[in-house]
């Protein structure tokens, strides 16, 4: 093909084809290469195909999508206010907290009564339920999905020590609705977001400051970053098969990575993907707070404080955090042990 150099022809034909038609034939692309414009086109197409892309995030129309969060918690009064406020700022419509405290234990109403009165937080009575089954946490999750799927478009299943952070788009922070309303998630039944676990940052004791500000150093146990947590659609039409795993919830949903790319994963993906969002996991906090967590047990049962079980907990802490004599002494003093 003879290359036409006429500016008049360029303005009428090429420019019109470039900006008014999506399909650009190969001959025109060859011409554009001559003037260097094709490089920009290739970059734009790559960005569109590989990353979350919003034309103008500042002008996004207020979303009608409703996103809720479900969690189960026990002895978390020191941390529950920060958790609730964090997800309120992210735009979540409601949080369902399954209260797993002992019958005569603390009450979440003592610290978040205002959020309960406003309707943003709803407390579900699971008090004393711990220990009756081997899958208490999953019982709570399945009850939440069954009971409230008609009130939300999506439900996130996170723990109190897990904080979702959504990556900005074009320099603009997104709410959870704005994130999930993006076209890259249209085909997703579940969005799986990787952990990024944090260490004790060489702190020893509880401090009444936000967890997200106190702990900045990453965990030594990098393999744990492969764990994911799920946000699941509520209008799934096919049968949902229970996974009996808090990182998966259901084993037969169409999973996506945090940037919307399809990938069928259940509860673990390594290396982690942080392109769309990340869950910052404050798993141990300080050694003194960790010891309180060990005493508390999990949703299923209280750990027997025998030497074998305590040994497991001791070694896990120092697999995640730097080992120092002072931390070892605190653990031994609290549990009357003699670990080295």
Residue ranges and their predicted role:
Residues 4-49, 137-142, 166-340:
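Catalytic-site signature of metal-activated, phosphate-bearing donor transferases
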Residues 93-94, 153, 189:
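Short acidic/polar active-site loop segments enriched in Thr and Asp
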Residues 104-157, 166, 171:
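Active-site-proximal specificity loops/subdomain of glycosyltransferases
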Residues 71-85, 101:
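Active-site beta-to-alpha loop of glycosyltransferases that engages the nucleotide-sugar donor
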Residues 94-99, 124:
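Short hydrophobic alpha-helical runs that function as membrane-insertion/retention elements
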Residues 85-94:
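Short, acidic, metal-binding catalytic loop of nucleotide-sugar glycosyltransferases
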Residues 66-68:
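Cell-envelope/extracellular polymer assembly enzymes that use nucleotide-activated donors
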């Amino acid at each position: 093909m003879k290359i036409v150099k006429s500016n008049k022809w360029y303005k009428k034909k090429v420019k019109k084809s470039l900006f008014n038609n999506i399909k650009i034939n190969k001959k025109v692309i060859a011409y554009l290469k001559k003037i260097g414009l094709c490089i920009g086109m290739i970059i734009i197409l790559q960005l569109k195909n590989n990353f979350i892309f919003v034309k103008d995030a500042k002008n996004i129309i207020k979303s009608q999508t409703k996103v809720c969060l479900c969690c189960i918690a026990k002895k978390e009064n020191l941390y529950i206010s920060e958790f609730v406020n964090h997800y309120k700022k992210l735009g979540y419509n409601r949080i369902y907290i399954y209260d797993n405290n002992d019958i005569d234990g603390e009450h979440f109403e003592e610290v978040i009564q205002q959020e309960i009165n406003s309707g943003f937080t709803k407390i579900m009575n699971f008090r004393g339920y711990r220990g009756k089954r081997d899958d208490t946490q999953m019982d709570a999750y399945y009850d939440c999905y069954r009971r409230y799927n008609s009130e939300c478009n999506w439900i996130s299943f996170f723990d109190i020590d897990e904080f979702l952070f959504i990556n900005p788009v074009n320099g603009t922070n997104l709410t959870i609705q704005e994130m999930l309303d993006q076209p890259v998630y249209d085909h997703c039944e579940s969005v799986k977001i990787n952990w990024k676990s944090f260490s004790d940052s060489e702190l020893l004791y509880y401090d009444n400051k936000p967890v997200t500000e106190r702990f900045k150093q990453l965990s030594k146990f990098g393999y744990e970053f492969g764990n994911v947590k799920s946000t699941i659609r509520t209008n799934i039409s096919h049968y949902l098969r229970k996974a009996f795993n808090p990182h998966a919830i259901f084993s037969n949903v169409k999973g996506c990575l945090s940037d919307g790319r399809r990938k069928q994963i259940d509860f673990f993906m390594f290396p982690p993907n942080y392109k769309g969002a990340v869950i910052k996991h404050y798993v141990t906090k300080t050694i003194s707070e960790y010891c309180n967590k060990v005493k508390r047990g999990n949703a299923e049962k209280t750990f027997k404080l025998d030497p074998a079980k305590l040994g497991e907990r001791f070694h896990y802490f120092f697999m995640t955090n730097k080992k120092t004599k002072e931390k070892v002494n605190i653990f031994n003093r609290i549990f009357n042990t003699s670990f080295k």
